[in-house]
Structures are given as C-alpha cells and as structure tokens.
Swiss-Prot record:
Keyword Transport among UniProt keywords: yes
A Pfam family annotated for this UniProt entry: PRELI
Cellular localization per UniProt: Mitochondrion; Mitochondrion intermembrane space
Assembly with partners or alone: Forms a complex with TRIAP1 in the mitochondrion intermembrane space.
Free-text tissue specificity from the UniProt record: Expressed within the blood islands and in the liver.
The entry's keywords: Apoptosis, Lipid transport, Mitochondrion, Transit peptide, Transport
Annotated Gene Ontology cellular component terms: mitochondrial intermembrane space; mitochondrion
Organismal lineage: Eukaryota, Metazoa, Chordata, Craniata, Vertebrata
Name of the molecule in the record: PRELI domain-containing protein 1, mitochondrial
Example GO molecular function: phosphatidic acid transfer activity
Length: 215
C-alpha cells in the first residue's frame, strides 16, 4: 500500500495571474531540477475549457542506498507527463502528473487544484495531493518514505518558484487576460511541436497507453 499526502496553500496573486504564471514559471531559481518542458497536446473543448498535456524532464537524485537499483546504462532523469484542464468560467485549473519511467522503483502521482481563495478573492488557493508507491521488494516502505519527503520538499520549491514569477509579473505591466495568455500558449505549443524531438514523441506515445486523465 502506498503513501498519501495532501496540503493546502495560498498564492498571493489573483487566479488569472496565477494561471498565466503557471505557463511562465520555468525556468526560475527554484526549478533547477526541471531540465525540459514540451507541450505535446492542446485543445479547447466545446464548453471552452483548455486541455493540455506536457512532457517534462526532471533530475531528482535518489539516496545513495537506492542507487544500486539503477542499472549502469539507465539514465537517472525522470520523465513526467502533466495533464491540465483550465475552466475559465469557474476559474479553476486542475493538473495531474505522473512519472512514466522508473515507476517500479517509485511511482508518484500528483493532483493539484487551483481556485480563487474563498476568503480573499485577490489570492489563489492551491490544494495538492500525492500518491507515492514502490514495487521494490524489501525496501518499498523506505522508498515511499523518501518519495513523500521529496514531494514535500518539491512543494516548497514550487511555491517559491510561483512567488518568484508572480513578483516579476506584478512588477511589470498589468497581467494579460486569460484569452491572451491561452492564445500565446497555443502559438508556443505549435512552435514547440514542430521542434519536438523524436524522444519526446516516443515518450508521449508510451504515456498515452495509460488511461488519459483529462485529454
């Protein structure tokens, strides 16, 4: 049985601005573990929701005792699939992420919901949930505990990264509207798709064998 963790936080920025910051947060000083990001799918539904799928490459070193479970010829980078759905009418954004390699060693699934803070409409509430599991016989509990601690550490980094991008945006011109941001993100997605590597395409194809969360 895996481990579960949940947290509730607040970003001191309006929901529209947090939505814009979400697509602009890499790189930032707190995201050095994020190596690449590629949008591999995007569409607007009939009810005007924005659906996206991104492929991210991250580097997160395992503890020394777990290194022996990696074959010498296997890359230690972790490939992450992120599905997201943006509902501008209800002002919510939900993301679901999971790793598509090294899942036997440790599988981490995360769900985040961004919505207007009910106590302060100028802030955004973020609810995060994570499920950590491992199939390694004899050490699965230790791996899961490590994964849970790593998740909590990454939540702190993610929050600081968001705050950094929000501060930069708030110090510049007024934030762009949701429609403008979505349009620019779509154009960027088209450019990224044209330049996507064969490796990214292959990994995205493998990810599609798992039941899609949103798209």
């Amino acid at each position: 049985m895996g481990k579960y963790c949940a947290s509730l936080g607040v970003l001191k920025g309006p929901w529209d601005q947090v939505f814009a910051a979400f697509w602009q947060r890499y790189p930032n000083p707190y995201s050095k573990h994020v190596l690449t990001e590629d949008i591999v799918h995007r569409e607007v539904t009939a009810d005007h929701k924005l659906l996206s799928r991104r492929l991210l490459t991250k580097t997160n070193r395992m503890p020394r005792w777990a290194e022996r479970f990696f074959p010498a010829n296997v890359a230690h980078n972790v490939y992450i699939v992120e599905d997201s759905i943006v509902d501008p009418k209800n002002r919510t954004m939900t993301t679901f992420t999971w790793n598509i390699n090294h899942a036997r060693l440790m599988a981490v699934e995360e769900r985040c919901v961004y919505r207007v803070n009910p106590e302060n409409s100028s802030w955004t509430e973020v609810k995060r949930e994570a499920w950590v599991s491992s199939s390694l016989f004899g050490v699965s509990r230790a791996v899961q505990e490590f994964g849970l601690a790593r998740f909590k550490s990454n939540v702190t980094k993610s929050t600081k990264g968001f705050e950094y991008v929000l501060a930069r945006m708030q110090g510049e011109a007024p934030s762009k509207t949701l429609v403008e941001t979505a349009k620019e993100a779509t154009e960027k997605a088209k450019e990224t798709a044209l330049a996507a590597t064969e490796k990214a395409k292959d990994l995205a194809s493998k990810a599609a064998t798992k039941k899609k969360q949103f798209v």
